Amino acid sequence: MNIWKTLLLGMLVTGSAVSAPVELDKVAVIVNDGVILQSDIDTATKTLRANAKKSGQALPDADVLNEQIVDKLIIDTLQTQEADRIGVRIDDTRLNQAIEEIARNNNQTIDELSAAIASEGVSYEEFREQIRKEMAASEARNALVRRRINILPAEVDNLAELLSKETNASVEYRIGHIQLRFTDGQDKSALEAQAKELVEKLKQGADFSTMAYTYSKGPKALQGGDWGWMRKEEMPTIFADQIKMQNKGSIIGPFRSGVGFHILKIEDVKGLETVAVTEVNARHILLKPTVILSDEGAQRELNEFIRRIRAGEATFGELAQQYSQDPGSAAQDGELGYQTPDLYVPEFKHQVETLPVGTISEPFKTVHGWHIVEVLDRREVDRTDSAMKNKAYRILFNRKFNEEVGAWMQELRAGAFVEIINEEENDG
């Protein structure tokens, strides 16, 4: 499914803020000081059914589907509220860059993307605002979950040592997941029996995606339980511990965690791939907007730096030392040293990945301020000790992040005021 089509399902939360008023619309759910309207739920259902029809995917009964959609809308609303609470704002520059990336990933121009969105009954402005909201929610979630993650140096060293003993090859798995969640007062043995019954049905040929839609309470339930392609090192620990050398089509489980019982299916496996790290040596000049220096002023000043460098009036290093507000690199003529692009924020990463060597970028904005950057060199690096430690840290971070984000969402949901309004209350 195209990226923008997946995002259409997100065009639900507080939909009344960006769409035309709907006659006799009703409040379906109260979430803290916000609401989810019945039209939001109806739009989500319509979109999901349309996408399922196009892909030939079976959906569960209407009641089960409605419950899954309402659960997702509640979580989406809470994340949007968290973004508002901590003051996350996505400006037009970052928004435009994100939409351009969506278009590139779909091999479309912006006009083609806009036309495709319109064919789904969504205006381009509605789409833009939803992407802005999705970005803000994602940024808030990432920031708040990162604070909860602690990685000890010994953990990094131990994992780096293990990785260094492996070959350059790694196997990727496409994983399907069903989670049956414990609830207060529930008989855990009854839940285990249900999980075993589902496993038997799956082994007899039941469709995994349909079973996930119907029964799963996991984070990918509305995607039919599909976690996509992952190496073991990228998976949540509870997944990785269960996967040994099983073949495509294997059903694994049920197995128990602190939140419930889990069932996995290996939808597909693809083989060995060589691990090679591309490192980029770049230098930059950073200007931070202030009350005195506006965004436009920062852009003008950086454009003047570019002119002076090209005219031979000053070198990049001289200007970085004199003007850059990144103290760590300014003293080094703006040079950042060899780094993997993944270590940078998305906008900066895009620049250092795509700029030709020796080319200075146009001014661009990140969360840190306004930059110009020049790529000095690129190199391919094998498994050096430094690369292994960077990789080990990313693996540990991703693993803990995937585990912690679920716990954070549960806590967010548990601490929220949520009231589902039934028809009688609306009619009354």
Curated annotation (Swiss-Prot):
PROSITE patterns linked to this entry:
PPIC_PPIASE_2
SUPFAM superfamilies named among the record's database cross-references: FKBP-like, Triger factor/SurA peptide-binding domain-like
Classify the source by domain of life. Bacteria
Keyword hit for Transit peptide: no
> What compartments host this protein?
Periplasm
Q: What InterPro entries does the record tag this protein with?
A: OMP_Chaperone_SurA (IPR050280), PPIase_dom_sf (IPR046357), PPIase_PpiC (IPR000297), PPIase_SurA (IPR023034), SurA_N (IPR015391), Trigger_fact/SurA_dom_sf (IPR027304)
Q: Which GO terms describe its biological process?
A: Gram-negative-bacterium-type cell outer membrane assembly; protein folding; protein stabilization
This entry's Gene Ontology molecular function terms read: peptide binding; peptidyl-prolyl cis-trans isomerase activity; unfolded protein binding
Class of this enzyme: isomerase
Tell me where in this chain the PpiC domain is found. 170-268, 277-377
Q: What is its EC number?
A: 5.2.1.8
Q: What keywords would UniProt list here?
A: Chaperone, Isomerase, Periplasm, Repeat, Rotamase, Signal
Tell me which GO cellular component terms the UniProt record holds. Answer: outer membrane-bounded periplasmic space
Q: Which interval of the chain is the signal sequence?
A: 1-19
Q: What does the record give as the reaction this protein catalyses?
A: [protein]-peptidylproline (omega=180) = [protein]-peptidylproline (omega=0)
In terms of Gene3D superfamilies, this protein maps to:
3.10.50.40, Porin chaperone SurA, peptide-binding domain (1.10.4030.10)
- Where does it primarily localize? periplasm
Any idea what job this protein has? Chaperone involved in the correct folding and assembly of outer membrane proteins. Recognizes specific patterns of aromatic residues and the orientation of their side chains, which are found more frequently in integral outer membrane proteins. May act in both early periplasmic and late outer membrane-associated steps of protein maturation.
Q: What is known of its domains?
A: The PPIase activity resides only in the second parvulin domain. The N-terminal region and the C-terminal tail are necessary and sufficient for the chaperone activity of SurA. The PPIase activity is dispensable for SurA to function as a chaperone. The N-terminal region and the C-terminal tail are also required for porin recognition.
Q: What is this protein called?
A: Chaperone SurA
